[in-house]
Amino acid sequence: MIGANNQRDINMVQEIWKDFHDNEPPLKILSLEEAEVAKVSLNAFVVNKIAFVNFLGQLCDGMDNVNVHNITDAIGLDKRISPYFFKFGTPYGGTCFPRDSAAFIRFASNRKRDAKNLKFADEVNADLYQSILDKCVAYDKVGIIGISFKPNSPVVIGSPSSKLIQDLIEKNITVFAYDEFDESFSNLNGLEDKIIKCKTPQECVDKSDAIAIMHPDNKFSSLNTSDKFVIDNWGVLDGN
């Protein structure tokens, strides 16, 4: 997707981007204004999708003979839905989703409309975070596995884990944490000195009373969590 209002700019951007991919992705040329709306709308749509599946996960929590991941796997086979970004897990965060959700809400307001769907998505996100926090505060020692906003990244901007760490520290709860990137800890803006860094995820489990698995990474599936309270919304320990 290229946003430009003249052919010279279109050609220049195409020339730059041709070296960044090996395949031939579809190309869509839009005006600058169309591209801006499209970019924000894309993430806003994904936020709605994530919010729905996270709401569904909370509805299914505690039901007998119900595993939400079996349900979403089945629904995701429908081509109208697809399995992408359709998995119950932790609240969305990072640098793009919260920002673009807020931008779309402002865009709608400027057009004299109320983006109620995205406001509800943000409420679902906040409720999901609160439910994780409420479960953690019942324990004196809490382990956080995965502190960046997504796997394979050291970025903690807008990370639910970083907020969880801060809120637990404020409640005088001892926090143990593991992340595959050392840089993730240095990006915590001072919080890294108030937590206990673990070298392995199993060490994090062993030293904690309760564990929150915040990343959907199957390398955590073999963790021994016996006698621990575990928050595993992603279903990592179930092999989902």
Question: At which residue positions do the language-model features occur?
Answer:
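Structural/interface elements that position substrates and couple domains in central-metabolism enzymes
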Residues: M1-N240
